[in-house]
Design a protein with these regions (language model features):
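Bacterial N-terminal signal peptides
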Residues: 8-19
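Membrane-interface soluble catalytic domains
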Residues: 25-32, 231-237, 253-261, 268, ...
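Metal-dependent active-site segment of extracytoplasmic phospho-/sulfohydrolases and closely related
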Residues: 37-41, 56, 221-260, 295
Length: 408
């Protein structure tokens, strides 16, 4: 316990210095954008820019920085299960990747976590627009919100699509002069699900890239809306002072959907454009936790205190000094957890291998291993490790232990 208290005290001391460090690294006020927009395309596959003609997105890619793969954590959504999961019991109503992206960290602090909008609220106007009610647990510290949609509302006859999101986004843009906006276009995620439910013989059955795919159509229509939104920014005189981050909340598997254990669902593109961002550059890798620290740096505000993503210095005209080199911790964690999941599945499927509730032998060892496994649905406990390196080390040791239990 003493070691834990000392560690917490040390962490508190470090965090107390964060505002001073960030302030020292922020760009001069004259160079800062006046509006930051996080523009989320639901279920935005990293393959989309290469497979679908998206002229408005392509134009922004040429004007800014393009990251081919933006990695998020495993794409679980434990918000709707029964009995309620710890995730739901802590009040979260969306999938895990949304919360991670808005926090700038995968080391979430249940009950205490702050989000990017808190970096502006209350003195700078914030706005959130989405055609889905699942993100309501992330809606704090937004002055203006328009959210409606989702499975239940559609079943009840409400037609709330991306067109409504565009309407409210442009309305807020004109009427309330926001400094930060989170715009979430939901229709692509809904359309991807139609591939799973398509009748047998359909060219897009279990294939979002098949001929006539609703997902492709939704991507193309969303690109039209993106162009219209950018036109509104230009007509209102805001474009030259706006920085935009266009990405997904998660990717999409070819069959449609975003199961936690499917790598296709973990990656989406990221396009950054606006003042302070290099033009016409392309990079291979980033992480969703990097978006908030980079956005906050450009806007001259402090990110959430526990945000540990990396400022994307390689994409910036005037990056801060001493940005650490690129690592791939989120990718490493995802693949490590997938390996553990696969080994556990084999062990528990072995004849008579149900974990015992006590006693000696391999069964009780397996039960202990399961308790030591902090999978994605236990993400609210990850912060107890303190760092990603410690989390990774723990799970590498767990994987090695599990492999010794494998049936001969």
């Amino acid at each position: 316990m003493k070691r834990f208290v000392v560690a917490c005290a040390t962490l508190a001391g470090v965090l107390s210095l964060v505002p001073l460090i960030i302030d020292a690294q922020q760009p001069p006020a004259a160079q800062r954008p006046e509006l930051a927009i996080l523009y989320t395309v639901d279920g935005f596959s990293d393959k989309a820019p290469g497979r679908v003609k998206l002229p408005n997105l392509e134009a922004l890619m040429a004007q800014g920085a393009y990251f081919r793969q933006n990695w998020t954590v495993q794409t679980a959504d434990p918000s709707n299960g029964f009995p309620p999961s710890p995730w739901a019991q802590n009040g979260y109503t969306s999938s895990i990747p949304n919360v991670v992206q808005m926090s700038g960290t995968a080391m979430l602090l249940p009950g205490k976590q702050k989000y990017v909008q808190d970096s502006f609220f209350p003195l700078k106007i914030t706005a959130h627009v989405v055609n889905e009610i699942s993100y309501r647990s992330l809606d704090g510290s937004f002055h203006y919100t328009a959210q409606a949609g989702g499975t239940g509302m559609r079943a009840a006859g409400y037609k709330v699509g991306n067109d409504k999101t565009l309407f409210w986004a442009t309305t807020f843009l004109r009427e309330v002069d926001p400094t930060f906006m989170w715009i979430h276009m939901q229709d692509t995620g809904v359309a991807a699900g139609e591939s799973r439910n398509a009748p047998a013989g359909s060219p897009y059955k279990d294939n979002i890239w098949g001929e006539g795919s609703p997902y492709i159509k939704a991507l193309q229509q969303q690109d039209v809306y993106l162009g219209q939104f950018v036109d509104t920014l230009k007509k209102t005189g805001k474009w030259e002072k706006t920085v935009m981050f266009i990405t997904g909340d998660h990717g999409e598997q070819t069959a449609g959907g975003h199961p936690a254990n499917v790598p296709e669902a973990w990656t989406m593109p990221l396009v950054m454009v606006g003042p302070g961002i290099k033009k016409g550059v392309t990079f291979d890798y980033t992480e969703s936790i990097d978006t908030v620290p980079t956005l906050c740096y450009l806007m001259g505000v402090n990110p959430p205190l526990n945000a540990d993503g990396r400022i994307l210095a390689e994409a910036l005209v005037n990056p801060p000094a001493n940005v650490p080199p690129r690592q791939q911790k989120i990718k490493e964690i995802n693949l490590l957890l997938l390996d553990i999941e696969n080994v556990l599945a084999k062990l528990t499927a072995a004849p008579g291998a149900a974990p015992a509730r006590g006693g000696q032998g391999r069964f009780s060892a397996l039960r202990q291993a399961q308790q030591d496994y902090f999978d994605i649905e236990r993400i609210l406990e990850w912060h107890q490790f303190g760092t990603y390196d410690r989390f990774i080390e723990h799970h590498k040791e767990l994987l090695a232990r599990l492999k010794t239990m494998s049936p001969k």
